[in-house]
Amino acid sequence: MSVTTCQILDGKALAQKIQLGLGERIQTLKSPMGRPPGLAVLMVGDNPASAVYVRNKEKACTKIGMASFGRHFSTDTSELEILAEIVRLNQDERVDGILIQLPLPKHLDAVSLLYQIDPKKDADGLHPLNLGGLVRGEDCIRSCTPAGVMALLKEYNIPIAGKHAVVVGRSILVGKPLALMLLEENATVTIAHSRTENLAEITRSADILVPAVGKANLITKDMVKPGAVVVDVGINRVADRLVGDVDYAGVLEVASYLTPVPGGVGPMTVAMLLKNTLLSYERKL
């Protein structure tokens, strides 16, 4: 049995809709606050993909009326220099959100730098206090990519409660926080990873399947239950194009919903980053 009509989960369209709402909210709040919300993005080195992501974030800020403060450091910048900039941004009243663009050069400890960001300005939702708040189910800043996945599922009215959700990947960026968010919505959650022995058997049992590994075409048609919802978080460069972790053409034949790459989760991550920054701004009212 195969599903003949698969609906595309259009992250680009939803992200634009969210950003439109954020822009309207900013226009309303700008006068009482005396300034727009501000997002600072720290980038170290010359990773081409990171440079594209940073430009996209800056463009999105401009589009909705949010101030952006880009900080670009050379590859050989010391951890102390980055730390000094984080301390300065923590104290800057114009800045409501701080993001460190990952990955960082190998000589820098991303975790220790993330820990130095004021939790109230943690636009990426990766500070231990915010991750701990997620574990406890508190109202806190949520990790952007997992929050974007959840927003997509909710926008398309996809049932989550009681469903078996399989997350492939256990990173602190996506896999672990997403599993917690799905659990919060009463899904039964399985996390699969590089040491999982029976991956295809597990993915075939998923009502909601979220690969987040960074390995092109990892999930093939035969690994997906007919009618499953597939949200592809992976982004991989293959020759001259970007692809996800899913064999798109094959899985399109069996899934009931599927995200494209690009145009699926990526734009949602940026929208959630802006939403988190606006939330931090609003909490100063």
Swiss-Prot record:
Catalytic activity: (6R)-5,10-methylene-5,6,7,8-tetrahydrofolate + NADP(+) = (6R)-5,10-methenyltetrahydrofolate + NADPH; (6R)-5,10-methenyltetrahydrofolate + H2O = (6R)-10-formyltetrahydrofolate + H(+)
Any one cellular-component term (Gene Ontology): cytosol
Keywords: Amino-acid biosynthesis, Histidine biosynthesis, Hydrolase, Methionine biosynthesis, Multifunctional enzyme, NADP, One-carbon metabolism, Oxidoreductase, Purine biosynthesis
SUPFAM superfamilies in UniProt: Aminoacid dehydrogenase-like, N-terminal domain, NAD(P)-binding Rossmann-fold domains
Tree of life domain: Bacteria
Biological function: Catalyzes the oxidation of 5,10-methylenetetrahydrofolate to 5,10-methenyltetrahydrofolate and then the hydrolysis of 5,10-methenyltetrahydrofolate to 10-formyltetrahydrofolate.
Protein name stated in the entry: Bifunctional protein FolD
Species of the source: Microcystis aeruginosa (strain NIES-843 / IAM M-2473)
Gene: folD
